[in-house]
Amino acid sequence: MVLLSFSLRFIAFTLTITLTQIADGFQSRMLMNNGLALSPQMGWNSWNHFQCNINETLIKQTADAMVSSGLSAIGYKYINIDDCWGELKRDSQGSLVAKASTFPSGIKALSDYVHSKGLKLGIYSDAGTLTCSQTMPGSLGHEEQDAKTFASWGIDYLKYDNCENTGTSPRERYPKMSKALLNSGRSIFFSLCEWGQEDPATWAGDIGNSWRTTGDIQDNWKSMTLIADQNDRWASYARPGSWNDPDMLEVGNGGMTKEEYMSHFSIWALAKAPLLIGCDLRSMDKVTFELLSNKEVIAVNQDKLGIQGKKVKKEGDLEVWAGPLSKKRVAVILWNRGSASANITARWAEIGLNSSDIVNARDLWEHSTYSCVKKQLSALVEPHACKMYTLTRRKA
């Protein structure tokens, strides 16, 4: 009887632990299944161009420009406020407060304005005691309260940074905000920004909708190419609902040439990276708009198959990047990272096609089609430029 009683207690204990693990696992995956980020997020973020020089007028004007330019109609929906929007001290109730001098109407009024334009409003906080600017408090230890505050303001997106983190692992800090958002009563996109320090691709898919794989991007060729390579390492972890994030776009900020920005946008699109514009939308020039509004390139990024393309071939400075698309298509980039024009070739076996396949090759930047291409695709590519294609198999 004693043995039977012990056995029953052990079984009950084991069952309790197992059910708890199942429940915890289910809860951890619920945020990923919040119905958001079925394709990579598209929108705008204030940091790259404005850093702390932000106010509610700028955010409203940016929302206006997103609509009037036509960018919102092709998928750019998030207007994301980055660091420096809040007061240094919380209020008497312990809540975050919008900075009176720059956001006098408050975040709720701003959210209402952005929503009235058919857009979504994002905001920024930090999994530490202060944000990275050290001008406002972080959310560490205030996750539930801040998540409810964000929800009450109508926030749609949270970028969650990693400064002033007390030396605690992000694996301990980030799930707390994930659960808080889950319990906030509002579906809020959760963007983890721990700079790839603890390989978030391997664990963040159960916690958030995207995760930074790298440090901050800079508006220059060296930074952009380095980050593209670092992000490529984690390609197999991306999936609908959870994406690798190599940081925001620098297109239009002036530090690179047109060809370099074209390469930047093309690689980000193929890599299923978030397409978050980082320039001043109110004054972007024609070239910037044409790059950011290329519907054919954007379609690769937003393809419903949701498989991240990656580097498949490297010969010195000449590279081939490729990835599968829906309807058995393939996206291909021929990228010249060198200083002289060069021919680049992608052979069918290198990009997932059969040697017998005959394809139509659609040039996504020239908006032209090459019919009945066999065995390989070649092009002369200018320095720091790329060619981007979608390949569609022809029926026998």
UniProtKB/Swiss-Prot annotation:
Q: Which cysteines in this chain are paired by disulphide bridges?
A: 52-84, 132-163
Give Gene Ontology CC terms.
apoplast; plant-type cell wall; secretory vesicle
Glycan attachment positions: 55, 343, 354
- GO MF assignments: alpha-galactosidase activity
Please state the Enzyme Commission number of this protein.
3.2.1.22
A GO BP entry is: carbohydrate metabolic process
- Catalysed reaction equations from the record: Hydrolysis of terminal, non-reducing alpha-D-galactose residues in alpha-D-galactosides, including galactose oligosaccharides, galactomannans and galactolipids
Chief location: secreted
Kindly list the places in or outside the cell where this protein is found, as annotated in its UniProt entry: Secreted, Cell wall; Secreted, Extracellular space, Apoplast
User: Which residues of this protein are catalytic?
Assistant: 161, 216
Entry keyword annotation includes Transcription: no
Q: How does it assemble?
A: Homodimer.
> Its biological function?
May regulate leaf (and possibly other organ) development by functioning in cell wall loosening and cell wall expansion.
Q: What is this protein called?
A: Alpha-galactosidase 2
Please tell me the species this chain comes from: Arabidopsis thaliana (Mouse-ear cress)
The top of its lineage is: Eukaryota, Viridiplantae, Streptophyta, Embryophyta, Tracheophyta
Gene, per the UniProt record: AGAL2
